[in-house]
Amino acid sequence: PREAASIDPQERLFLQHAWMAVEDAGYTRASLQIAPASGQSGQPGQVGVYAGVMYGEYNLSGSLASIANRVSWFLNLHGPSLTLDTMCSSSLTAIHLACQDLRLGRTRAAIAGGVNLSIHPNKYRMLSGGQFLSSDGHCQSFGEGGDGYIPGEGVGVVVLKRLSDAQRDGNHIYGLVRASALNHGGKTNGYTVPNPQAQADAIARALAEGGVDPRRVGYIEAHGTGTKLG
């Protein structure tokens, strides 16, 4: 509690919501001391922490690594602990990497998510200078005349396990991550210009790896920024 007032607000919120996710999953600090898989060495607490973040605006500490590391320290976890920045895809990339480690048996469980706060005006100065912000205060994704987006704030954290482990342990299962894919747009007409074909390739790869028929997809959440470039 003495440190809470001075640490990075993103660090504080991610820790708070990580704790809430752990409680919702039915775990305590003690029950998270999960032993390594059979035949593997290592200390108990084989739970990874993966935090996605876009901007580091709180310069008193100057360390985004602490967003994930503080959770691992507080819960006495010995799995991978990393904070990563891939801009708008940061939280999804964190979940992708968490799932990869689970599938490869490197961890027994994972705490993954993202946090994004706007706590300094320099962020808006940069976005405005790059013509990312909407001129009328509204985001018109997929609409005619859109010229930018309005940044939001938020934090979200989930607890992930292999399906077989979750079923064996009687966990409440909210949903399944069947597959995920990660790539880059490469060289385009400009550094901030998206590559539609690369995005389509990532979607197709995830569908193929997950064995999902695209015709059976019932809900899509898109990254529709509403900028002039899409």
Short names for language-model regions:
Residues 1-230:
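Condensing-enzyme catalytic core of the thiolase-fold
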